[in-house]
Amino acid sequence: MDLEAARNGTARRLDGDFELGSISNQSREKKKKVNLIGPLTLFRYSDWQDKLFMLLGTAMAIAHGSGLPLMMIVFGEMTDKFVDNAGNFSLPVNFSLSMLNPGRILEEEMTRYAYYYSGLGGGVLLAAYIQVSFWTLAAGRQIRKIRQKFFHAILRQEMGWFDIKGTTELNTRLTDDISKISEGIGDKVGMFFQAIATFFAGFIVGFIRGWKLTLVIMAITAILGLSTAVWAKILSTFSDKELAAYAKAGAVAEEALGAIRTVIAFGGQNKELERYQKHLENAKKIGIKKAISANISMGIAFLLIYASYALAFWYGSTLVISKEYTIGNAMTVFFSILIGAFSVGQAAPCIDAFPNARGAAYVIFDIIDNNPKIDSFSERGHKPDSIKGNLEFSDVHFSYPSRANIKILKGLNLKVKSGQTVALVGNSGCGKSTTVQLLQRLYDPTEGTISIDGQDIRNFNVRCLREFIGVVSQEPVLFSTTIAENIRYGRGNVTMDEIKKAVKEANAYDFIMKLPQKFDTLVGDRGAQLSGGQKQRIAIARALVRNPKILLLDEATSALDTESEAEVQAALDKAREGRTTIVIAHRLSTVRNADVIAGFEDGVIVEQGSHSELIKKEGIYFRLVNMQTSGSQILSEEFEVELSDEKAAGGVAPNGWKARIFRNSTKKSLKSSRAHQNRLDVETNELDANVPPVSFLKVLRLNKTEWPYFVVGTLCAIANGALQPAFSIILSEMIAIFGPGDDTVKQQKCNMFSLVFLGLGVHSFFTFFLQGFTFGKAGEILTTRLRSMAFKAMLRQDMSWFDDHKNSTGALSTRLATDAAQVQGATGTRLALIAQNTANLGTGIIISFIYGWQLTLLLLSVVPFIAVAGIVEMKMLAGNAKRDKKEMEAAGKIATEAIENIRTVVSLTQERKFESMYVEKLHGPYRNSVRKAHIYGITFSISQAFMYFSYAGCFRFGSYLIVNGHMRFKDVILVFSAIVLGAVALGHASSFAPDYAKAKLSAAYLFSLFERQPLIDSYSREGMWPDKFEGSVTFNEVVFNYPTRANVPVLQGLSLEVKKGQTLALVGSSGCGKSTVVQLLERFYDPMAGTVLLDGQEAKKLNVQWLRAQLGIVSQEPILFDCSIAKNIAYGDNSRVVSQDEIVRAAKEANIHPFIETLPQKYETRVGDKGTQLSGGQKQRIAIARALIRQPRVLLLDEATSALDTESEKVVQEALDKAREGRTCIVIAHRLSTIQNADLIVVIDNGKVKEHGTHQQLLAQKGIYFSMVNIQAGTQNL
C-alpha cells in the first residue's frame, strides 16, 4: 500500500556515509576475498541482558510487522460491506431513512470495524516502542563494550605491529568503524525483523484469502527480489572502495594537521590540499558510480512493481467477475502481498547497514583477536619482587618488522653489572636506541638473548619487567594534562611529596613553582606549553618517581640549555647511584664518568672500556672525542686560568640570572593552562553556543554550480510524488467498477486500467533513475567540496587557533571525517525524497478536496499530530546528537593521545590507566544512548500507530457521509488512500530527522570555520612582494604574550638587529623567549607592541607567503611526513617542482646523501609516520636538506644540532657553516661551542636583551654569557 516504503528503503543511503577507515594496503591485498564476519559474530559482545533486550525487541518487531497485513483483512471485509451496500445509497438523501434503514446497519458495522482498527493501533503502539527502544539499548551497551575491547586490544599490541599498521589509521577506526557497527546492530535490526514479519504475514494472509492471485503476484516479486540481491552485491563493492579512498584522505589530513607548524613554515598548504583532494576525488568518482548503479536498479524495481500491479489487477478482476473472489478478498490479497513485498524495500537501509557493520567489525574484531607475542596485559611470566640489575646481551641480531630486510643489530654482545653505568656511543643509526628498546621488550630480537640476572627477559612478566625500568628519551612525550598527572604516569600510587622530591631531583621544582597554577598547570598537546628543557626535566622526574632498578637515558639532556644541563646532569648522576644505567649520549662530555663506555659501529660493539682506556686505544671513541673537543677546546683553554677564580662564585651570574630559569614558551606555542576538566567543559559549551545556526539554503548554495542536476532531479521527484495520487484515483475507480452492473463493461474497464498501470511503470523507470542519479551526484560533489573547503580553511588558520585545545589534531580530524558526511546525509538523495514526498502529499490534498472536502478536513486534522511527533523527535535527537558528539570527542582525545604516543604509554606501563580513563569517558555517550532509546521509541511508536487510528476514524466518518449522501464509497477510498499515503510518505521524510539534526549541527560548525577570518591569513595575496631582499632583520621594542596564556609575559620590549649576511646567535636560559623570536619572524604570531622589520619594512606590511618563502627553518624536533625521503626534502620549496638533482645536491650539503645511498630504495625510502623509521640525526639532516632546498635568504636554526651524535654533529655543523655563507642566519643554541664564530651573540633574559657582542667581547664583560660558558666548559673539561 505504501509506495514510499519501497522508494525510501531502496534508495536510502546509509547516513554513516561510507567514511574513513581503510584497511591498510598490505592487508587489503590479503583481504580482498573475505572481509565480512558472520552475521551472528557481530553480536559476540552481548551479555544475557542484551540478549533479552534483543529477544523482546525482535518479538515485538514481529508483532508490529504483522499489524498491517491483519489490518488488510479488516479492510477487505469492510470493502465488501461497502460494495454490497453501494446500491442502497445512490438515492437522494431524504430517501435514506427508509423502513429498513440500511444506513443504520452500515454505520453499526463500521463502528465495529473502527474498534478492530483501534485495537490493532493500541498493540502497535506498545510493540513499536519496545522494538525500537530495546534494540537501541542493546546496541548502546554492546558498542560501549566493543570500544573498550578495541582500545584494550590496541594498547596490548606490540611495537612492530604499530610500525606496520600506522597510528593514524587506528584513530579513524576507533571513531568511524565502530559507529558503523553501531548503525548495524541497533534499531535497524529491529526494523529489519519488522519488515520481514510484514513480508511473511502478508504472504500468509494472501495464501489464506486467495492462493491463485497470490501465486501470480509472487512470480513478479521473485524477479524483484533477485534484482535487489544483485544490486546489493554491486553496492557493497563500491562501498569498500569508497571507504579505502576516504581513509587515505583522512590519514593525509591528520598528518598535515599534526605537523601544522612545518606545513605553514614551508608554505605546504596547497601541496597538502592537493594530496587530500586527490584521495577525495577518487572517493567521489566511486561514489558517483555507486549512485548510477544504485539508481538503475531503483528504476527497474519500480518498473517491475507497476507491472505487477497491472497483472494483479487484470487477473484479480477476472476472478471477481467469475465470482471466485469477492472484491474485498481480492483487495485483501492484493494489498497484503503488496505490503509484504514493499516491506523488503523498507528493509534495504537495514540490509545496507548490516554488511557495512560486518565489514567494519571484521577489521575491529581481527585486531581484538590478534594475540601479540609480547603482551603487556598478560599475567604470565616470572614476577620477582626485586632484581639486582645484571644485564647481558649475547649475540643479539635484530631488524625492525616494518623493514625486515635492513639489519640493525648484527651480533651484539654486552654485559652490564648491577649498579654499573654503561654508555653507548657511536654514529646516528648504528643501533644504540634499538638496544634500549629491546631491553624494554618493545621488540624481541630475531636471534640471540637478552637476560637480566641470568634470566632471559622473555621469561619475565612483561609489565613487571618494564616496571623495573625507567626511561628518559630524546624527544620526551608529555600527555595533555597537568604537570602532576604527567609525573604520576611514572607510578600510579605516588604521593604529592614523592612527586615534589622527584621534581627537585630533576631540577624542575623552581620553574614549576613559578607557573600560575604550579603543579596543576596543563602542559598542552604533547607538552606544547613547555620548552624542550622543561619537558625533559618533567620526563626525568617521571622516570625517577618509578624508583627504577634499571635506568635508560636515551639522549636525556640533549634538549637542555647549558645551565639546566649542568644541573640535570648532576641530578642524573645522583639518580644513577645504586642503579644499573644505560646512557646513550652524543655529547661525550656527559658520559666520561661512565663505568664502561661501549663504542658501537654498524650494529655491533667494537670496543669497550673506561674513558681513559678507550682514549689509549685510539679507536672509534677516540675519533668521536677528537671531533667534539676540537670545538670546545677553545673554550676550555681560555678558561683554565679563570676557572679557579670563578670556582668560588659557583658560576652564579649577575642579576640572579640562575634563579630565573622560567620558561614561558617555545617549541610549540602555548596552549592555555586550565586546571580542571569542568572548566574545559564550560568552554566547550560556550563554543557550541557561539556557533550560529546555518540556514538550509546556505548549505544548498554551495551546490549551486550543480543547479542543472537539481532542476532535473526536482522535476523527476515531483513527477514521482504525483504517481501516488494517480494510483489512488485508479484504485478507487477499479473498486467502483465492481458495484452492480454489466460484466463485459467491467472487464473492458479493468483491461484499460491495467494498461495505465503499465504506462506508469515505464514512466517511473526514467524518473526514478534520473531523480536518484542527479541528486546522488550533486551530493557526492558537495561532500568532496565541503571536505576540501574545511581542510583548506583549517590550513588557513593562524597559530593561535591551533593552540586552542578545542582544535587539537584529534578533534579536527574527527570533524573533517564526520561533518561533511553528515551534511551530505541531509542533502543529496535525502533532498530528492523530501521533494518527492512533498509533491505526493500536495497533489494528494488537492485531489482529495475535489472529491470530498469533509473527509479531507478530518484526515488533515490528524496530520499535524504526526508532524508534531516528528518535530519533537527531531528536537530531542538533535540535543542528543550534540551531546554525543562532544562526549565522543573527549573519549577520542584520550584514545588519540594514547595511540599516537604508544611507545611512551608502554614504557611507563600506563596502558591500564589510559584504558580506565577512556572507559570513564564512555559513560557519557552511553547515558545518552539510553536516553535516546526511550525518546526514539516513544516518538516512533506514536507515528506508527497513528495510521491505525486514522483508519478507524476515517471509515466511521466516511460511512456517515455515505449514508447521508455527501460522498460515494469510491470517493472515500480515493480521499483516504491519497491523504494517508501522502502522510505516510511525509512520515518517511521525518524519519530522516536525526540525520537532518546532525547535518544542521555539522553545517553550522563548517560554516563557522569557513567564515573565520584568521589574524594572519596564510593564503592572503595582500601586502608587498619586494623584488629583492637583502636579509637584514630588526626587532624594535617587541612585546609579546602567547594568545592562549595572555597573562604570562614572554617578550618584554626586545630589540635586536642582524645585518645582511650576519650570523646572530640567541642564548639564554630555557623559556626566555629565544624560540618566540623565530616564531614572530615566521609570522606565526604578530607582536602585541613594537615592530619586526625585514630590510626596514614592517613584517605586517609584507605579503605573508613572500615573507615565509625567504626563511628556511630547522628546528629541534623536526617533523617529517610519511612519504619518501626525496619528497620530504622537496617539501622545502612548494612553490615549484624541485628536480632530483637539486634534491641530491641539498642532501649532499646536509651530509645525508651517503646514508641515503646505503638504503635499498635510496631516495624513494619511506620515512614512516613522523619519520619514525629514521634516527634523530638522520631526521635532522633531512630537515636541513629541506631548509636548504628553498635557498632561503634567512636561515633559522632552532637547536638544529642538539639531537645529533658527535660524528653527525660535526659534519652537520660543517654543512650548516657552509649553508650560512652569504645568508643571514639566526641560531638558537644551548651548546655554546657551536656559536662562538657568530658575528653577534645576544643574551636574552626575561624577554629582553641583556648582553650583546662577539664571543670575545662578551667574555670580557664577565656577565651572564661568561657564566654560561664557564658552566659548560666545566662539564666538558672534567
UniProtKB/Swiss-Prot annotation:
<feature type="topological domain" description="Cytoplasmic">
    <location>
        <begin position="236"/>
        <end position="293"/>
    </location>
</feature>
<keyword id="KW-0325">Glycoprotein</keyword>
<dbReference type="GO" id="GO:0045121">
    <property type="term" value="C:membrane raft"/>
</dbReference>
<keyword id="KW-0547">Nucleotide-binding</keyword>
<feature type="binding site">
    <location>
        <position position="1116"/>
    </location>
    <ligand>
        <name>ATP 2</name>
    </ligand>
</feature>
<feature type="topological domain" description="Cytoplasmic">
    <location>
        <begin position="873"/>
        <end position="932"/>
    </location>
</feature>
<keyword id="KW-0968">Cytoplasmic vesicle</keyword>
<feature type="domain" description="ABC transmembrane type-1 1">
    <location>
        <begin position="54"/>
        <end position="356"/>
    </location>
</feature>
<dbReference type="GO" id="GO:0016020">
    <property type="term" value="C:membrane"/>
</dbReference>
<dbReference type="InterPro" id="IPR027417">
    <property type="entry name" value="P-loop_NTPase"/>
</dbReference>
<dbReference type="InterPro" id="IPR003593">
    <property type="entry name" value="AAA+_ATPase"/>
</dbReference>
<feature type="transmembrane region" description="Helical">
    <location>
        <begin position="294"/>
        <end position="315"/>
    </location>
</feature>
<feature type="topological domain" description="Cytoplasmic">
    <location>
        <begin position="994"/>
        <end position="1278"/>
    </location>
</feature>
<comment type="subunit">
    <text>Interacts with HAX1. May interact with RACK1.</text>
</comment>
<feature type="binding site">
    <location>
        <position position="1045"/>
    </location>
    <ligand>
        <name>ATP 2</name>
    </ligand>
</feature>
<feature type="binding site">
    <location>
        <begin position="1070"/>
        <end position="1076"/>
    </location>
    <ligand>
        <name>ATP 2</name>
    </ligand>
</feature>
<dbReference type="GO" id="GO:1901557">
    <property type="term" value="P:response to fenofibrate"/>
</dbReference>
<dbReference type="GO" id="GO:0016324">
    <property type="term" value="C:apical plasma membrane"/>
</dbReference>
<feature type="binding site">
    <location>
        <begin position="1176"/>
        <end position="1178"/>
    </location>
    <ligand>
        <name>ATP 1</name>
    </ligand>
</feature>
<feature type="topological domain" description="Cytoplasmic">
    <location>
        <begin position="137"/>
        <end position="185"/>
    </location>
</feature>
<feature type="binding site">
    <location>
        <position position="474"/>
    </location>
    <ligand>
        <name>ATP 1</name>
    </ligand>
</feature>
<dbReference type="GO" id="GO:0032376">
    <property type="term" value="P:positive regulation of cholesterol transport"/>
</dbReference>
<feature type="topological domain" description="Extracellular">
    <location>
        <begin position="208"/>
        <end position="214"/>
    </location>
</feature>
<feature type="modified residue" description="Phosphoserine">
    <location>
        <position position="24"/>
    </location>
</feature>
<dbReference type="GO" id="GO:0030136">
    <property type="term" value="C:clathrin-coated vesicle"/>
</dbReference>
<dbReference type="GO" id="GO:0009410">
    <property type="term" value="P:response to xenobiotic stimulus"/>
</dbReference>
<feature type="transmembrane region" description="Helical">
    <location>
        <begin position="755"/>
        <end position="775"/>
    </location>
</feature>
<feature type="transmembrane region" description="Helical">
    <location>
        <begin position="972"/>
        <end position="993"/>
    </location>
</feature>
<dbReference type="GO" id="GO:0090554">
    <property type="term" value="F:phosphatidylcholine floppase activity"/>
</dbReference>
<dbReference type="GO" id="GO:0005524">
    <property type="term" value="F:ATP binding"/>
</dbReference>
<dbReference type="GO" id="GO:0016887">
    <property type="term" value="F:ATP hydrolysis activity"/>
</dbReference>
<keyword id="KW-1133">Transmembrane helix</keyword>
<keyword id="KW-0963">Cytoplasm</keyword>
<dbReference type="GO" id="GO:0000139">
    <property type="term" value="C:Golgi membrane"/>
</dbReference>
<keyword id="KW-0812">Transmembrane</keyword>
<dbReference type="Pfam" id="PF00664">
    <property type="entry name" value="ABC_membrane"/>
</dbReference>
<feature type="topological domain" description="Extracellular">
    <location>
        <begin position="732"/>
        <end position="754"/>
    </location>
</feature>
<keyword id="KW-0813">Transport</keyword>
<keyword id="KW-0677">Repeat</keyword>
<feature type="transmembrane region" description="Helical">
    <location>
        <begin position="215"/>
        <end position="235"/>
    </location>
</feature>
<feature type="transmembrane region" description="Helical">
    <location>
        <begin position="48"/>
        <end position="70"/>
    </location>
</feature>
<feature type="transmembrane region" description="Helical">
    <location>
        <begin position="831"/>
        <end position="851"/>
    </location>
</feature>
